[in-house]
Structure formats: C-alpha cells, structure tokens
Design a protein with these regions (language model features):
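Divalent metal-coordination and catalytic microenvironments
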Residues: 144, 202, 261
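Sec/Tat-exported extracytoplasmic proteins
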Residues: 145-152, 185, 252-256, 263-264, ...
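Conserved catalytic/binding loops enriched for acidic/polar residues
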Residues: 269-610
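Auxiliary tRNA-acceptor-end handling modules of aminoacyl-tRNA synthetases
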Residues: 1-129, 147, 151, 162-219, ...
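The catalytic-center signature of Zn2+-dependent metalloproteases
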Residues: 161-184, 246-302
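Short conserved micro-motifs at the rims of enzyme active sites and ligand-binding pockets
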Residues: 111, 135, 220-221, 302-308
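Zn2+-dependent metallopeptidase catalytic core
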Residues: 132-156
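Soluble non-cytosolic domains of exported or imported proteins
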Residues: 90, 127, 131-139, 242-247, ...
Length: 610
C-alpha cells in the first residue's frame, strides 16, 4: 500500500473474475483496482490492479475441545480473553492450533493400543509435481505417521496422489475439504506451510503447503558449500537425485510440521555437543538437531575423514514430545482438567536440552542456521570447511566450455555462509541465556552469558573476522568472476559486524544486564577495551582492511559519544578511548611508510576532541 501510494478503490476497473462454490467453501477470484499516487511509469490511469482471492469457509457445527498453550512447548496458537475471570482482570488465554484427531476405538486407546483416528489427516500431492520427486513428497508427509504413534494414533497422516479428472471429476485442490502440497513453477526459493483454523477453538481445518520450484537451487548450492569439504557427494552442482530427494523430503516434513501446528524451535539445534556431530554413529541415530522444526539444515561441522556422517536434518525427539503433548487424547477429561496431565508431561522434560523450546531473543543458543552447543567451535569447523570448499569451488562448479556464472553465484553465496558463521558468534556478545520455565522449576529464565565465553567469542572474531581473510580473496578465483568490488564487500561485512557489536541496543542491554540480570556477563567497558587492543595492537602490520577497521572503529566511538539514546554511564569510557586513539595515532604520524603516516594523520584528525 505504501509502495504504490494506494488510495480508494476504482469500482469501474474492479470486477469478479471467477467464483467457485464447494460443499464447505466459496472461492472468489477478482481484480481490484485502486487509485495510486505512486503508480508505475507509463501508467496514464494512475491506478494499480491486483488479482486477489477471497475464501469464505463454513466452520464446523460441533466445536472441537480446546487445548491451552503451555509456553514451554512451541505451538501456533490463538489469543483470547476471558472477561468473566475472578482475577480482577481480563485473563489472556492461549489456545493451540491442531487438527481434530479422535480415536475410532476409545477402549483400545485407553488400554494403550495404537488406534486409527476417526478422520486422519490426508494430503494430496499436486499433479504438477515432477514424477521423480513425488516419492520424496510422500515420505516427507508420512514421516510424521511414526511421530503420531507417540500420541497413540496409527495411520494418522496419509499422503495421496490427487485424482485425475477422469477418476474424480468433482475433486479440486481449491475445495477446503482437501489439504494439499502444491508444486509452484516460480523462481522463488522457498517453501511454506500455512493452515486455516477455526478462530473459536484452534481446530485446523485445512492446509495447502507450497513448494516453489527454485527452492531446489538453494538446497543444491548450500549442500555443496556447507558439506562439500567432508562429503564427496556434495562436490558437484549435478547433485545426485537421491541426495536432492532426501533434502526435499526433509523440507516437506518441516512444512508439514508447521501445518500440524508446530512453529520453529530455534533452540533445538544447540542441544547436541559439537563434537558429537562429527560422529557417524551419533548423527545416524540422532540427526543434527532435536527437531525438524529448527533451521538446522546441514551438518557443516563434520570434517574431512569423519566417517558415516549424516549431513541432512531429520525428525527428532522434540517432535515426538511436542506431537504427543498436542495430540494425546484425554476422553474423560475437559480442557480444564487435562491441563494437570499435560503439565506433568512438560514438567518432566522441559529442562532437558533435548526438549527445550526457544524462538529467538538474545539467547546465543537460539539461532537460525546453526548446529551444536558451542557457536565458537561450530563456526571454527564451519569456516575450516569453507576454506576447503573455496579452494575447490572452480573445479566443483564449472565444466570445460561453460561460463563462470555458477562459480560467481556460489562464490557470492559463500560470503553469505561465512557471514552466518561469524554472526553465530557475534550473538554471544552481550548474550543472555533464555530458558522458558514456570515458577517451581530450578533456576531463573534469564541469565547473562558469562564473561569468559564472551571473551572467547571476541578472540575468535579477532582471528576469523578482523584479520584479513585472504582465503576469500584468491586472485586466481576472483579474476574469473569479478572485475571489482570484492574488497569492499568483505570490508562492508566487517563494518556491519562492528556496528552490530557496538550498537546502542546491545551496549544498553549489556549495561542493563550488569545491574539487573543474574550472571557474570561482560561489561561494555571491557568490550570496548578489547576491541581497541584488537584494532590498535602494538606492531600490528597495516593492510587496507586493518586501516579501514581502525578508521571505522574510531568513527563509531566518536559517534556513540554523541548518541542521546546511549546510557550516559558509557560515554566517559568512550571519550577516554577516543582520546587514547588520538594519542596512539599521534605517536605514529612520524614513523613508517608515507601511506601509514597519512593514515595516522587522518586518525588524529577524526579522533581529536575540540
């Protein structure tokens, strides 16, 4: 709306394109035209048109019993308010979104037998899906069947091929009675797992998972970059069908998880020790994270020579636990009385790292695209592998007679992978460990990451970020794909990282944590001192990157002194370091090469205090 400056609707240019009616829903596709103050060029009508679909869905006549959210278990949920509460306030209520699964045989279910649900969850595979990928789509859906057995159900989720028009002329993927996985021909590199739920109870009525064709490209590239050093099967852009198929299967499982009601659990990837991820027996049994719902896509920790390694994610113990909690049927209990049984289930497991849930915040153990319990060690292994990949990138991506287009694409994505490994460590600085818990459980939800670990992180960055990363600047490689700009790209990565570390938000958070959060965290003063000694180390050889970092650090310190939003406590420290930079630079203006003298002259100019 803001992009096009959309105003009122133009009724003369708006109309219904198509209307379809089914037993439980109506689908209306129409073109809506709006007056626009920022219409695209060469548009004399000053309007923009959009094709929009609206769905009108008949809700169930019989309400499904609700299940209240326990925040220690990740679940998509609806927020409601109870205005009849006796608590002298309106109570906020969270109701989870889930399918209506009820056992056919209540007596057998009560005896602990596996029982089929009255109405299983059925997904129809889009006929547009390439034939060779359909078995992997089916496996990705039905992998959850084993998980549902933990909740007492067998054959709870089923994958079927969509019938042809000859087989069933009334079948349509637009019919709300049929959930589906759609295969969409587009350059988008993604997959999604949306769902439609009853706003009264949270009952999931239908979902249409979408697989975008070009998502294959993302997985092909990242498989090579993140596992190629230790995984011979990944050392090509002609990824074997079985390997790509396994990746598709796991993406489908992830999206089905969303459609079942599960959100991302970004804490799950930090449960396993980093060194265990180098063990073939461990990874084959346990995977690389405790859930498929984390963004822990690849095992980038395993090193060349490690044997029988699992490189791709799979379902794990957290998936069993969360599905059992969400779908276990309690026939003799109400939504209120079942809370006791459900709470006991969570109390037993929620403090075990295998079953912890976390969605974000400032917790270094709740990150995306990471694996292992130690971000520093994991990133060390990741960068070590990436160096091997870069040294072989030309050979692995380009065949004789081909252009260097793929090499260029993979090199650019290499920078992105390297950046992720670096930022996994940056999050430790000023980090606060967050554990979702309730009163009565040991410890407290928030604790500062101890200073020793934060100093380890700074030392890692000193070696792997602030020092010139010559392995990313190999002229024999760069000369094939770029005529300019690589040095600037890498310097901008350093500058962006420095700005992140010395952001007002992070520094204020560190000051606040010093005074209000349990734990021996790193002080912001110690952080600034460590960075100063990193950038202005005695007798440190100067190259373009070091000089640029010294300038950027000086500019950042100077700017922070004048920031109104920064806690005043820190400004005297910053001013003292600004003076120290001036003093250090002043000493060096009369020694060394001309270029170095000029550099330090400039530093004295920008650090001088009027």
């Amino acid at each position: 709306k803001k992009q096009f400056g959309i105003g009122s609707i133009d009724s003369k240019r708006s109309f219904i394109d198509e209307l379809k009616s089914f037993k439980e829903n109506i689908e209306i596709r129409h073109t809506l035209t709006y007056r626009s103050s920022k219409a695209p060029k060469n548009n004399s009508t000053k309007t923009v048109s959009f094709q929009i679909n609206h769905s009108i869905i008949l809700l169930p006549t019989e309400l499904m019993p609700i299940r209240y959210l326990d925040p220690r278990v990740g679940w998509f949920n609806l927020k409601k308010y109870n205005y009849s509460s006796e608590e002298l306030k309106s109570d906020e209520i969270r109701v989870i979104q889930r399918w209506r699964l009820e056992p056919k045989d209540l007596d057998a279910y009560a005896q602990g037998e596996l029982v089929e649900p009255i109405k299983p969850i059925v997904y129809y595979i889009d006929p547009a899906t390439p034939i060779k990928w359909r078995p992997y789509f089916k496996k990705g859906i039905e992998d959850w069947a084993k998980v549902f057995e933990k909740a007492g159900f067998k054959n709870a989720i089923i994958a079927k091929s969509a019938p042809s028009e000859e087989e069933d002329p009334n079948f349509s993927l637009e019919d709300v009675r049929y959930s589906s996985i759609r295969y969409v021909a587009t350059t988008t590199r993604n997959a999604t797992g949306p769902r439609v739920s009853d706003p009264r109870t949270g009952e999931i009525i239908e979902s249409d998972i979408i697989w975008y064709h070009n998502h294959l490209r993302s997985y092909r590239n990242r498989y090579l970059l993140e596992t190629g050093a230790a995984n011979p099967k990944a050392r090509t852009l002609d990824t074997p069908e079985g390997e790509i198929g396994e990746m598709i299967r796991r993406v489908i499982s992830h999206e089905v998880g969303h459609a079942l009601g599960l959100p991302h659990n970004m804490k799950a990837s930090s449960a396993y020790p980093v060194d265990s991820l180098r063990s073939g027996s461990f990874t084959q049994k346990n995977g690389i994270a405790t859930t498929i719902m984390d963004y822990a896509r690849y095992n980038y920790v395993a090193q060349p020579g490690d044997e029988n390694i699992r490189f791709v994610r799979q379902l794990g113990p957290y998936d069993d636990y969360s599905i059992e909690w969400g779908y276990r049927f309690f026939p003799m209990k109400t939504s209120e009385t079942e809370k006791v049984s459900l709470r006991k289930m969570v109390d037993k497991k929620s403090m075990n790292p295998l079953y912890m849930y976390g969605s974000g915040g400032n917790d270094p153990k709740t990150q995306t695209e990471n694996i292992g319990d130690d971000p520093i060690k994991a990133s060390y292994y990741g960068i070590k592998n990436l160096k091997i990949v870069v040294s072989n990138l030309d050979e692995w991506t380009t065949k004789k007679g081909q252009s260097y287009e793929d090499l260029n694409e993979l090199y650019n994505e290499t920078i992105g992978v390297y950046r992720r490994y670096i930022y996994h460590v940056i999050k430790m600085i000023g980090g606060i460990n967050e554990t979702v818990m309730v009163k009565g459980q040991d410890n407290v939800p928030y604790q500062s990451l101890n200073a020793k670990e934060q100093k380890r992180a700074l030392s890692f960055l000193g070696q792997n970020l602030w020092q010139t990363q010559s392995w990313l600047m190999n002229p024999n490689l760069i000369s094939k794909i770029k005529s300019k700009g690589i040095l600037k790209v890498l310097q901008n990565l350093q500058f962006s990282a420095l700005n992140q570390i010395l952001s007002i938000r992070r520094l204020n958070r560190m000051i606040s944590a010093e005074n209000t959060i349990i734990g021996d965290g790193l002080s912001p003063e110690a952080l600034i001192e460590k960075l100063f000694h990193t950038f202005f180390k005695e007798n440190m050889p100067l190259d373009d990157s070091v000089m640029a970092l010294q300038i950027r650090f000086t500019e950042r310190v100077k700017k922070l002194v004048n920031e109104n939003e920064l806690n005043p406590k820190l400004k005297s420290t910053l001013l003292a370091f600004q003076k120290l930079i001036y003093k250090t630079a002043k000493k060096k203006t009369k020694i060394g090469k001309v270029s170095e003298k000029n550099h330090y002259l400039y530093l004295t100019k920008i650090s001088e205090i009027p």
